[in-house]
Structure formats: C-alpha cells, structure tokens
Amino acid sequence: MAKEVWRFIDSGYCPPAFNMALDEALLDWHSEGKIPPTVRFYGWNPPTLSIGYFQKVEKEIDLEAVKRHGLGFVRRPTGGRGVLHDKELTYSVIVSESHPAMPKTVTEAYRVISQGILEGFRYLGLDAYFAVPKTEEEKADLRSPRSAVCFDAPSWYELVVEGRKIAGSAQTRQKGVILQHGSILLDLDEELLFSLFKYPNERVKERLQRDFKKKAVAINELTSRTVTIEEAKEAFYKGFEKGLNIVLEPYTLTAEERAYVEELARAKYESDEWNFKR
C-alpha cells in the first residue's frame, strides 16, 4: 500500500511571533482542507523564552532578565511551561483529529506523533524511550509541576534517554485539528535558563537547578561528537517518515501565505494583550 504523503516545511530561523503564527496558520489551513497534514522544522532568531498558554508572566517570569539577555519572548497557544529556545531543533506536527492513525485521547495521540521523534533519536544513535509515570508520586508531579521550567519533569510519553528528558512537547486541539510542537535540545545553557524565572529565594532556585541536571539532558551531552543542526534535521526528517509511516514532501510558503502569517504574528503574537494577558 502506498504511504500517505504529508507536507514538510523547514522555515529556518524566524522571530518568535512568526513561529507561533505559522503554527496557528497551518492548523487553520488544515482545518479548512487547504493543506495536507504537515511536519514543520524551525529555529528561533533571536533565541526566545516561550511560555505556556496558562502561565502567569508577572508571577513566574523575570522579564528584566529576558530583556537583559536580548531574548525574544512569546506565549504559545499550547499549554506547558517555560522553554528557552536556543540551540535546538523545534518541530510541529499538524494533523486532523479524525485522521485514521490518530487515537482519540490526547496522551495516545501524543505517543503516536512522538514516535517520529523517537525514531529520529535512534537515527542519531541514541537509545530513546517513552517515559510513562508509574508511581502515584510521578502522576501527582504531572498534575502540579514544581517549577515553571518545562524540562523539570517528564510528562506522559515524554522522550527520555538514560533516564533524563531530552525532548519536551505540548499539544493543543482546535477546529478538529491537533497541533503538537516541541523542542529537541542539541545543547542547553542551564545558567541562562534558570536566570529567567522568579523564585521565592536563592535556595529554592539552587535546589531546582540541581534537580534539573538530574532530569534533563541535551543531545550533545550524550554523544561522543557534536551533532549539528543539519544532522539533526536529517535524522528527524527520516524519523518522522519512519515513525508515522509517511512520505514527506518539501514545501515552500507562497508570498500570500507568508504575508498572512506575518499579519497574524503582528496582530496577535507580538501584542501585549496576548503575551501578558494572564
């Protein structure tokens, strides 16, 4: 049987508002039947702190530190916690909830989509596997995360190598369409990451940072040689094809599509109302 063809977009390094606007536009276009299911790869220029849809900026984020380090800042349309997007490959997958390969529940759909990432890690020679919380304590951690930092704990079907989280993802469902996007870390600047959040006191910050080192890891901490972004793209391109049993067909946005995304970025994702509303 012929494999299903999905669209593939590598949008390169883009401003934070554009990145979120393009993910939203792809969701909209797919819901309207204008485009097939899509896998997208992207990066961030400048490096950016993104926060989850429900996070409270004033309570959790040190905006002065974000400015001081010259970082971008944007609120995602998906849940989850704060992510520093810097030395990473960011991906998004846009597919209809009614797609025959998509299970009905969020966690099971998450597992199916993330199979593409799992295979990508294997192409890089890393033995990744899915973290499934077993104990009641681990399940409780998912319901009430200890910190505003995303990689603080593996969630359902998060990808783990040698017991440490290596890719963080979030999902939203709108208009009958699943949007899952996430970060595949090549390198991680923990000092910078932890300087961007507010803490009750320095002791709490130090403890969280110490715990974090035991729970999160980047690709280049695990490999004997440095994996480049181009190598990562190739591995995860093949990974998504294998994991989702699809063929990816590269696509470039038209001038009209790009203009639509830029307008959405300006009107919504660059606005204070969106980014600071909670």
Curated annotation (Swiss-Prot):
Sequence similarity: Belongs to the octanoyltransferase LipM family.
Annotated S-S bridges: none
Transmembrane feature ranges: none
Assigned EC number: 2.3.1.181
Domain of life per record: Bacteria
Signal sequence bounds: none
Subunit structure: Monomer.
Miscellaneous comment text of the record: In the reaction, the free carboxyl group of octanoic acid is attached via an amide linkage to the epsilon-amino group of a specific lysine residue of lipoyl domains of lipoate-dependent enzymes. The reaction proceeds via an octanoyl-thioester enzyme intermediate.
Domain BPL/LPL catalytic span(s) in chain numbering: 33-248
Pathway: Protein modification; protein lipoylation via endogenous pathway; protein N(6)-(lipoyl)lysine from octanoyl-[acyl-carrier-protein]
PROSITE patterns (alphabetical): BPL_LPL_CATALYTIC
Protein name: Octanoyltransferase LipM
